[in-house]
């Protein structure tokens, strides 16, 4: 899935204190974009509903000669019974790491790590805000759309790069 995206704001140097103090970013987005916990857990708190994952696809890009260059791309929608599309997420994994750690592709990544009691952390690389006609159609909602991308670490090693785009409807749950 590719989107034409017109960016109206982004930051690639994530200094949480600068974002916390930025009065132009609504509090709800600060919590969602910079939260240290699982978005799945945050969305359940915000919406008072259990989240579900709509697994779109998992695609394997492989190079049999160089297994370390082989990777998996997983795309999902995360939502609730009343709002099926709260977030679009695309994650990129090294095949070995994916097969070793993540055994339930129908489960949200954050939920899996929390239930497994695995210690992980994320390093946010970019937060962005913008408009996209394709996203407006997919989310059935007018923009702008907030998003982020980050690296997920386990035992100090990078295991996944994750891109997330959030529905503007999340602002309605404040």
Swiss-Prot record:
Gene3D superfamilies linked: Chorismate lyase-like
Keywords annotated in UniProt: Chloroplast, Plastid
Keyword set includes Secreted: no
SS bond partners: none
One cellular component (GO) term of this entry: chloroplast
Domain of life the protein comes from: Eukaryota
Primary localisation category: plastid
Cellular compartments annotated: Plastid, Chloroplast
Record-stated family: Belongs to the ycf21 family.
Protein's recorded name: Uncharacterized protein ycf21
This protein's encoding gene: ycf21
